Every structure is written in structure tokens, then in C-alpha cells.
Amino acid sequence: MQSNKMTKETKNVLQRGLENIHHPVSNFIRAQTTSSLFLLFATIIALWWANSDYAQSYQALIHTQLGFFIGDFELKASLKHIINDGLMVIFFFLLGLEIKREVIAGELAQAKNRRMLIICAMGGMVCPALIYSGFNWSLDSQIGWGIPMATDTAFALGVLTMVRKHIPSSLVAFIVGLAIVDDVGAILVIAIFYTQEISLMHLLSACALIGFLGVANYAGVRQPLFYFIIGVAAWWAMLKSGVHPTVAGVTIALTIPAQPKLASGKWLEKAKSIISAIQNKSKNMDVLGNKGHHEQVLKVRDFAERASTPLRRWEDALDLPVVLFILPLFALANAGVVINLSSFIESVQHPVGLGIISGLILGKLIGISGACWFALKFNIGCLPDKVDLNHVIGASLIAGIGFTMSTFIATLGFGDQDTALHVAKTSILLASVLTAILGLLYLRFVSTKA
């Protein structure tokens, strides 16, 4: 009788612990939705500040020089550069962790899902780039062809929550997978096409350090401090190489261990035995007053950590700082453009503006939905349950929200072209708002007809 009671209590303890473990996709969606709210708030502040009587103080703040010196060595950069070249590396590191998880255990782990997502994402990148290039062919502004390729995952999922009751949950997972592949494409574009002069020595040093991390992962090294120190050195070498340092963030993330040190079956056995031992020794379950129980609880914690993966732990640890701090700071430093009727008119008349607006709205729509139709027609891939081509058309409009990544690419491509950069940022905002509204209206219309 007592044994049955202990077994029941043990199961209850384990059940309560397991109830705290949520599905990775659910956690990802919730984090991205929260991120969209903070991003929106920071964007509104930046726009208000840049268009108010305090606009001069805004420009002074983002161009404030910060740094330190030791003897003759001096490291100094503007606040905007610190955010774009430093803090955003952490965002891209988190992005790399998410990409690795999706490839190993997420939507991209299954071949049939992977084929459809890759085909749709390729269409959603190539078509906008071609449309932009058509408007800017042989012009200096042609360098901005990568701007309309990107999708802002946080804003896209945030917008989708407005119609979440009217769309299949599998559509949200589809867009998450689509955005992940899209991010991979954007990262490759940044690494290959938005790199100026390359220092081969520094680039080889960065590659060697990242390769060393990969070997360490294979050898079973799991200490966070080790990966942090070598990772910072790789970031510095990448920064000096001429390749944008955010590329280092992604590649370092791919070396982070994704396998647990302790199999889940063994961890459950050990946890059960420890809980049973605690129950057998004493009825006093007070951890504070009972040193033995305290030590046993620490053992359970140690086993639990060994049963989880460094990749998931670090992803969870970075999620909140990126959502609450890094992405809003990026929006605050980069979204402050002067907007008025004349700036919107200039955007729709300028080749850069025409290329970005057409690329994000029409390019994403034609590219993603067209690629999906092609894949279905020739049986190359399949859609998730309850998702049809009409849903994909709505999703392709939502994918035209390119705020964060598009703005980031615009700052790389037009860093020394003030007019083009201003038009690009204004056009990204305008196109993102328009395509979000169109996507919401279309998905709502489709749901009423279903």
C-alpha cells in the first residue's frame, strides 16, 4: 500500500515537472509574438523622436561615440555601430541556434516538409530580388536587391496572432519554418554580397576558431565559458576580416552541442530513485531545514541539466534579452526616419522605393504562392494538415513584412548613400504595413468562406 502511495507521489512530482516543459514551437511563437510588441513600441518611439522637435537629440544619441582605451590601444564606435555590429551578433547567434534546432528536430527535420519550405522560401527570395533589380538595373542602388528578400519573423507571427482563431495552427508552424529558411538565405546574402574588402588573414583566423569550436563539440566539450571565449575571439576576427560579424554569430551557433549528456530514460530513472529515497528517509520534506534533502534536490537538478541540451538551454537563456533589449534597441537606432507626405511620395517615385514596395508585396506573394503551386502540381512537396493554397497566399502576404532584417540589409547596402537609405527605410515601413493589412484581410476572408 505504502509502495503504491510512493509510486503515485513520485509520478505526481514528475508530472508537475513535465508540465513545465512546453512544445518548442509554442515557445518560439510566444516569444516572437512578444518580440513584435516590443519592436512595434520601439519603432513608434523612434519615428516620433525623429519627427519631433527633439530630432537633433535623437541623431546626437545614436551617433554618440563610446569605447575605451588601454595605453595606446583604443576601441571606439558610435552607439548605432555598437548595436548593429555588436549586439545584433547575439540576435544572429540566437537565430543560428533556432536554425540548428529546426533542422535537427523541427519542421525542417522531415524531408517532405523541408522540400516544400525550401522551395517556397526560394521563390520568396528570388522573385522580390528580381523585381527590385528590374527597377534599379544598372543604377548604383542595385546593391539593395537583397532588401526585399527578408521576412521579419517576429512581426509576421505577431500579425498572425490577430487571426489565430480563424487559421489552422499548422499554418503558423509553416510560416515559422518558412521564416527560418528565409533567414538562412538572408544570412548567406549578407556574407557573400554585402562584404566589402576582405582581410584574408583575419577571415582564416575566424574560420579556424569556429572550426576549433566544431571539433570541441565533437569531442564532447560543453562548458559555456569555453564557447564564449573562443566565440568572442572568432567574432573579433570576423569583424576585422571585412565580413559582417553577424555571420560569426550564426556560424558559432551551429557548433553548439545539440545532444544531451544523459539520455532521457536514464534521467527519469535517476530522478525516480532520488525522489523515492527522499520519501523513504523521512516524512519531513522541508528542503531548507533538511540538508540531506537539499543535496538530493541538487542532484536532481544536476541530472536534469545533463538530460537537456546546451543548445536549448542557451536558446532559452538568450530569448528574453534579445526580445526585451537587443531587437528594440536595433529598432530604436535604425527606424528613426523623417516621414511625411512628401517622403511617402518620394518613396513611390524613387527606383529604390518602387523596388522595395513591389518586391515585398508582389514579389513575396508571387514567389511563395507560385512556388507552392509548382511544388503541389508536380508532387515535389506537401502542405501541413488543414493548410491549402489559399492559406499560403495569405501567408505569403504576411511574409512581406520585412522590417528588422530588411532594415539591417539596407544599412549594409546604403551605408554611405543617405538619400537611398532614407527612401529604403520609409519604403520598408510602408510596404510592411500594407502587406500586413492585405494578409490579414485575405486570411480573414478565406476563413469565412471555409
UniProtKB/Swiss-Prot annotation:
InterPro entries the record matches: Na/H_antiporter_dom_sf, NhaA
One Pfam entry name: Na_H_antiport_1
TM region(s), chain numbering: 35-55, 79-99, 117-137, 143-163, 173-193, 198-218, 224-244, 320-340, 356-376, 392-412, 423-443
Molecular function GO labels: sodium:proton antiporter activity
Major site of localization recorded for this protein: membrane
GO cellular component: plasma membrane
Keyword Metal-binding included in the entry's annotation: no
Keyword annotations of the record: Antiport, Cell inner membrane, Cell membrane, Ion transport, Membrane, Sodium, Sodium transport, Transmembrane, Transmembrane helix, Transport
Domain of life: Bacteria
Topology in the lipid bilayer: Multi-pass membrane protein
GO BP terms: regulation of pH
Catalytic activity: Na(+)(in) + 2 H(+)(out) = Na(+)(out) + 2 H(+)(in)
Compartments where found: Cell inner membrane
NCBIfam families linked to this entry: NhaA
Function (record text): Na(+)/H(+) antiporter that extrudes sodium in exchange for external protons.
Family assignment from sequence similarity: Belongs to the NhaA Na(+)/H(+) (TC 2.A.33) antiporter family.
PANTHER family for the chain: NA(+)_H(+) ANTIPORTER NHAA, SODIUM ION/PROTON ANTIPORTER NHAA-RELATED
Protein name: Na(+)/H(+) antiporter NhaA 1
Designated gene of the protein: nhaA1
